[in-house]
Regions:
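Alpha/beta-hydrolase fold nucleophile elbow
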Residues: 8-21
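Alpha/beta-hydrolase fold catalytic core
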Residues: 109-167
Length: 167
């Protein structure tokens, strides 16, 4: 408020840019500026760049299965890029198949928890392995719940590399 007054910028347009976690903070900031205890500051727009709009899909805590099925298609695309999957499909087809598996088979299975039948679990582990390029043993050891850091370390382990966070 002080800078706006000192520089006579009350009639200038004002925009807020929220990137990543700013996807949650940006709207809160706009709300606070518009309805603050002091003179309200109108905002002309809010720009969101790759917003993280729901922490539930980003935080890998025990009992929260959402990020696991949400990240699987990204794992699949990364494995495809590094030639760790056996497929003749295009990246787009493979990615779409991984999304379908994640939403219609893998995600619902995670919700069953320990009630999933052994045979069904083996089938899911096999499919998860085929989509991600990770060994069945690794997938089973992690109970089909692999966080990004573990995925990055394991995918290229046999070559002596790890995948970068932005790959």
């Amino acid at each position: 408020r002080r800078w706006i007054s000192d520089n006579n910028r009350w009639n200038s347009p004002r925009y807020i840019l929220g990137e990543s976690y700013g996807g949650i903070r940006g709207p809160l900031l706009v709300s606070e500026l518009r309805s603050g205890d002091l003179t309200p500051i109108e905002i002309n727009g809010l720009l969101m760049v790759a917003p993280a709009s729901d922490y539930q899909y980003l935080v890998f805590h025990p009992g929260n299965n959402s990020p696991h099925y949400g990240f699987l298609p990204s794992y699949a695309a990364t494995a495809y890029y590094h030639n760790k999957v056996d497929t003749n499909k295009s990246l787009q087809e493979f990615y779409n198949d991984s999304k379908d598996f994640s939403l219609n088979e893998y995600g619902p299975a995670l919700l069953k928890g320990s009630r999933i039948k052994d045979n069904d679990k083996k089938i899911l582990i096999d499919k998860y392995s085929k989509f991600t390029g990770l060994s069945k043993r690794f997938v089973e050891d992690f109970d089909m719940r692999i966080d990004p850091s573990s995925f990055r370390k394991e995918l290229l382990r046999d070559e002596g590399y790890s995948v970068g966070r932005l790959d």
